[in-house]
Amino acid sequence: GDRDGNPNITAEITTDAMELQVSHAIRVTIAAMNALRQMLSVSTKIVGATPELSASVEKDLKHIPEFEQRFLRLNAEEPYRLKATAIVHRLAFTRDRHAKGAPHVPNRDYANTAELLADLVLMRDSLLAHRGELIATGLLERTIRTIAAFGINHATMDVREHSDAHHNVLKQITGIDGYIEKSHDEKFEILTKFLADDVRFDTSQLEALGKKTVDTFVAINNLIDRFGPEAIETYIVSMTKGADDLIAAVVIAQQAGLVS
């Protein structure tokens, strides 16, 4: 996300990087769940399950018809393994949704890491309530901690840009004579009024560097829509000398729909 002074870091590169890290994170998480699934052969003939887990498995079976019938027969009395299998399916659906740019489907794929963690915690709590402490506090707990740390996005991306890049855009789209030469206080007053009045500008005629800056904000908005707010949480403005340097970025973010 660091494009400060680097012309090669475009909106497309940022999007590609996010897609790559999310794909990697989901692939690793699926592998972890498959390993966990092999350990969860606990039968209800020996160890029970909470009503919450049983209800969750029933809901999974309703929304995931792709469950192989042989697994349903073999694991009919193994709710923990069925739940782990459902999680693998939902992770695969999440990966496919991201690849296609399709909308989230509740109970089919995961909207965010919190939904995945809720499923894992449900399994852990059920195991703890039914003499399954060994696996609940072992491999399952380690899996929960790993996913809580990295999420299904692998990492939160920071985006960084030089303050001059934002003022360059505003010089072009506002058409204000001598904009760059104005003092920090003058720019701050102008920009805060733009924000307060929700002024919209035509960004279609920007020169290449200005378009690159605006495209970055559009890409951030799209990535947050696709991967959730945890995908990108921080935008860093370098070489700031006044409050106007920060407000300038916010005005452009407003044009991209990031700020209402």
Outline where the language-model segments fall:
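Extended, well-ordered protein cores
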Residues: 1-11, 21, 163-164, 241
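Conserved short loop/turn motifs at secondary-structure junctions
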Residues: 159-163, 234-242
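Secondary-structure transition/capping motifs at alpha-helix termini
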Residues: 225-231, 253-260
